[in-house]
Amino acid sequence: MLLCDRAFAGADTLATSYALSLAIKRLCPDFVFCGRQSVDGDTGQVGPSLAVRLGFSLVTNVMSLESAENGLFYTDRLGNGGNISAPAVITLEKSRKLRLPSIRSKIKPIEILSANDINADISLCGLKGSPTR
């Protein structure tokens, strides 16, 4: 899934998490994985904001994950660990080696969604929905 619309241009983390949360709700995932930072910022706010908007549990700065009986067992960057059950947003501390995509993912078309497709309030998207400038 790819969100692509001029309405999303100039978004800060608040507007970004708003648009992403609407798209994620369409998928009904058990877990949402986020990085610690983006290429254009280092605030670390999108993952936690998504958790709030989605009403999911949140674990941040995760270094490792393992399957557990009732969800996932995580270890964070301080060496603390615990279990987290679905639904949850998990922010990962370090980049991982990318695995080669499966053949199915190579040929599956990417669904492109606009602000209208996710029923977004345009006043909350992009530069219009960004209190930081």
Task: Enumerate the language-model features and the residues they cover.
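N-terminal glycine-rich FAD/FM-binding segment characteristic of electron-transfer flavoproteins
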Residues: M1-R133
